[in-house]
Amino acid sequence: MNLADVPKEKLSPGMRQYADLKEKYQDCILFFRLGDFYEMFFEDAILVSRELELTLTGKECGLEERAPMCGVPYHSVDLYLKRLIDRGYKIAICEQLTDPALSKGLVERDVIRIVTPGTLIDSTMLEDDSNNYICCLYYGNDGSCALCFADISTGEMSLAVPQETSDLTVRIIDLLSRYMPAELILNSQAMSLKSVMDFIRVRLQCTVTVREDTCFDLEQGRGTLCEQFGVSSLCLLYTSDAADDTPCVD
């Protein structure tokens, strides 16, 4: 039973709350807090029960058929998150925002964080002897290209700007090989770099998210970085005069 095929108006209030949140985070597994457990329903429950070898049960949801359900205890959730992250999944953590004992109606809930392979900061989920990079790759219609690597757990960030040449894809693959990111975000035009995409699929095997080119606005990105680091110009972040594939921002 897929949630997208279910008439939302027929769902119980609690399950409708779950459906509304799941609609906002369709690319994530939704961990929905119910008391002392994080529960998953419908296709998420089927997926997680298979990946983690959990018992698949059912829950009344307002339909004739019970919604597939599985869950994990909140006090040991990190163990389960780590196993899913290692398999490349993204998880949206939904918490109870009001006290169930004091709530007269439906407990207020919302997603408070999203856990992905490249955004881990919890030391229990990280390897002690290696970095955990997330990479953003942009490739423009005019041949412009840039890659940014960040290890959010340490604050390390590097930028590389390979120049348009006949071996551009080789340079991109070399950079990806050096950093071996756990997660990759790229624009839709970058999908046209066939050898790069083959390398990502076969060698990196990391979590990949494709965003529309409109998400890669240069001025907006420049302003966000200046605000984040408290500088008036990004030139103040440069640590080298590199103009090719040598990382030039630290």
Task: Locate each region found by the language model.
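Single conserved hydrophobic/aromatic residue that forms the stacking wall/gate
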Residues: 238-250
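Basic, polar low-complexity surface loops/patches
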Residues: 1-240
